[in-house]
């Protein structure tokens, strides 16, 4: 499960605006590249992602390992499914009770599933030996609560939102994570990864 997050745990404000959360994607000199000369460019303005060297190495390694993205319908609608071309991975699974919009990018490998558990099963089938990346937020929280998330990745930005859309959605209950096994300082961002502690694990 992954997303960019404020220090107080929000991935967007109440109107789904990310404010300064994504500024670090454009604050450095090193482009994020993958697959040879292919550039990950989903800035909307064609400027591409240019980050610090530390962030570029971290993000490149993570994105290169992803085969499938799992996202909620709200994010799909906000970004129009990245116009059928996700930032990484070969497939996208959208958790939604509504089908794919008629005529929307028929060439794109987007799969609409109305249940989070079924979405994870489908994503694993599509991913093969590669990773399944779950977008944090309401859908990510449901998948985490169902015990279907192995790792929590957070790109923590030094800003306080105070309110908005939470990284962990409306999750109700306590879940323990292991100590972070990845801690990388970028420019205006701290990259963290935690394994999810399973029930019965002794501290």
Regions found by a protein language model. Name each.
Residues 148-150:
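Short acidic amphipathic segments
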Residues 1-146, 158-203:
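Portal/gating segments that form or line small-molecule/metal binding sites
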């Amino acid at each position: 499960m992954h997303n960019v997050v404020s220090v107080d745990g929000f991935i967007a404000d109440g109107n789904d605006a990310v404010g300064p959360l994504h500024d670090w994607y454009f604050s450095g000199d090193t482009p994020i590249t993958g697959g040879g000369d292919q550039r990950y460019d989903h800035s909307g303005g064609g400027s591409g992602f240019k980050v610090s060297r530390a962030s570029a190495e971290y993000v490149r390694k993570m994105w290169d390992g992803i085969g499938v993205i799992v996202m909620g319908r709200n994010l799909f609608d906000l970004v129009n499914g990245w116009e059928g071309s996700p930032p990484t991975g070969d497939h996208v699974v959208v958790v939604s009770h509504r089908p794919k919009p008629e005529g929307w990018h028929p060439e794109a490998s987007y799969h609409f599933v109305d249940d989070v558990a079924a979405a994870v099963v489908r994503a694993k089938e599509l991913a093969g030996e590669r990773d399944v990346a779950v977008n944090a937020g309401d859908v990510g929280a449901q998948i985490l609560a169902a015990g279907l998330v192995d790792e929590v990745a957070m790109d923590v930005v030094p800003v306080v939102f105070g309110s908005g859309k939470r990284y962990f959605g409306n999750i109700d209950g306590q879940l323990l994570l292991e100590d972070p096994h990845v801690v990388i300082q970028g420019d205006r961002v701290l990259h963290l990864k935690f394994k999810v502690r399973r029930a019965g694990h002794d501290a």
